UniProtKB/Swiss-Prot annotation:
NCBIfam families: tig. The keyword Nuclease does not apply. HAMAP family: Trigger_factor_Tig (MF_00303). Its main location: cytoplasm. This is Trigger factor. It comes from Salmonella paratyphi C (strain RKS4594). It is found in: Cytoplasm. It is an enzyme of class 5 (isomerase). Gene3D superfamilies: 3.10.50.40, Trigger factor ribosome-binding domain, Trigger factor, C-terminal domain.
């Protein structure tokens, strides 16, 4: 076997292989012997068919199969010998074949980039230092009450915490625009659903009033034709409702799994959940900065085959989220996912190199802790832990999570990490 390797472009490679004629003939004869043992031909007992008849009847197909097998096996031998690491499926390009002559073919493929991590010491990470205060718990309790609120119609003017039912028609330069009109639109004030100035224009008005407000669409608004444009909205205010918050009664508290129904018990449960969320938020904030720094410090080429594969994964995930099927998933434009796919591949390659250079393996104690932390959010944590322990795929996924955490910690060990005092609300809003 003769082998030559050339770089086509970037990570592209072409391996050209020549297989000697005698190697092909030996393999063909060997396979014909195997065929002769199995075939049934009228007039001959099984395994007793003369080789010339077997060759006459099956020679062409056997030779084709043998060539395909030799191409595959010799390519594998070649990349092992040349220490090449292909990324994605290879493309075989057979040359002209003539019986009794050497056979030359080529294989085109991409290789994984050679990653040499640099700049880890220059990565800057700001670790949030946060504690859950009594005031944070008060805010969360208020949020829980608002989620269970009832609404009661009122006669007074709408204010920042009310809910209104309106008809509205929007126009720019006197012309109505698509999506700018609605009837019986229910708007809970104070949630930032509308463009700046809209809710302020509604506040102070009563049911039965019709009025016009002037607003300006933000420069970053999603509709290109409305970015930065001044608009008028004619509004008919049909109904104003005020929020009624439930009291922290024993019955209300027990809805959240607090068996004794006490306010102290609810506060303790809320604090525990907030601290669990906080732990995850701090971890994610630090991780995202470490990975961002790693990516910026290491500019690497990425095999197109890996990006294509990741795009297919993202397509399928998107289709599943919106109830689509496999066919619909593959029809989604690749442009929607290309940037995210490339980013994921780059991060995977860089973290993979961190894992390799640090000889990391998933810490089973960490895996156990991650499962327990995740399970604590469920009503029966023991049942969840047992379910994970009996599911190999779930356990492998959690080991990957643990290994990724360990890789991030290896990056942080060399990075410049500082601490910054932050409030619970500020950190959680950053995560949103």
């Amino acid at each position: 076997m003769q082998v030559s390797v050339e770089t086509t472009q970037g990570l592209g490679r072409r391996v050209t292989i020549t297989i000697a004629a005698d190697s092909i003939e030996t393999a063909v004869k060997s396979e014909l012997v195997n065929v002769a043992k199995k075939v049934r031909i009228d007039g001959f007992r099984k395994g007793k068919v003369p080789m010339n008849i077997v060759a006459q009847r099956y020679g062409a197909s056997v030779r084709q199969d043998v060539l395909g097998d030799l191409m595959s096996r010799n390519f594998v031998d070649a990349i092992i010998k040349e220490k090449i690491n292909p990324a994605g499926a290879p493309n075989y390009v057979p040359g002209e074949y003539k019986v009794g002559e050497d056979f030359t073919y080529s294989v085109e493929f991409e290789v994984y980039p050679e990653v040499e991590l640099t700049g880890l010491e220059s990565i800057e990470v700001e670790k949030p230092v946060v504690e859950v205060t009594d005031a944070d718990v008060d805010v969360m309790l208020d949020t829980l009450r608002k989620q269970q609120a009832t609404w009661k119609e009122k006669d007074g003017a709408a204010d920042a915490e009310d809910r209104v039912t309106i008809d509205f028609t929007g126009s720019v330069d006197g012309e109505e625009f698509e999506g700018g009109k609605a009837t019986d639109f229910v708007l809970a004030m104070g949630q930032g659903r509308m463009i700046p100035g809209f809710e302020d224009g509604v506040k102070g008005h009563k049911a039965g009033e019709e009025f016009t407000i002037d607003v300006t669409f933000p420069e970053e608004y999603h509709a290109e034709n409305l970015k930065g444009k001044a608009a008028k909205f004619v509004i008919n205010l049909k109904k104003v409702e005020e929020r009624g918050l439930p009291e922290l009664t024993e019955e209300f508290i027990k809805r959240f799994g607090v068996e004794d129904g006490s306010v102290a018990g609810l506060r303790a449960e809320v604090r525990k959940n907030m601290e669990r969320e906080l732990k995850g938020a701090v971890r994610n904030r630090v991780k995202s900065q470490a990975i961002e720094g790693l990516v910026k410090a290491n500019d690497i080429d990425v095999p197109a085959a890996l990006i294509d594969s990741e795009i297919d994964v993202l397509r399928r995930q998107a289709a599943q989220r919106f109830g689509g099927n496999e066919k619909q998933a593959l029809e989604l434009p690749r442009e929607l996912f290309e940037e995210q796919a490339k980013r994921r591949v780059v991060v995977g390659l860089l973290l993979g190199e961190v894992i390799r250079t640090n000889e990391l393996k998933a810490d089973e104690e960490r895996v156990k802790g991650l499962i327990e932390e995740m399970a604590s959010a469920y009503e029966d944590p023991k049942e969840v832990i047992e379910f994970y322990s009996k599911n190999k795929e779930l356990m492998d996924n959690m080991r990957n999570v643990a290994l990724e955490e360990q890789a991030v910690e290896a990056v942080l060990a060399k990075a410049k990490v500082s601490e910054k005092a932050t409030s619970f609300n500020e950190l959680m809003n950053q995560q949103a």
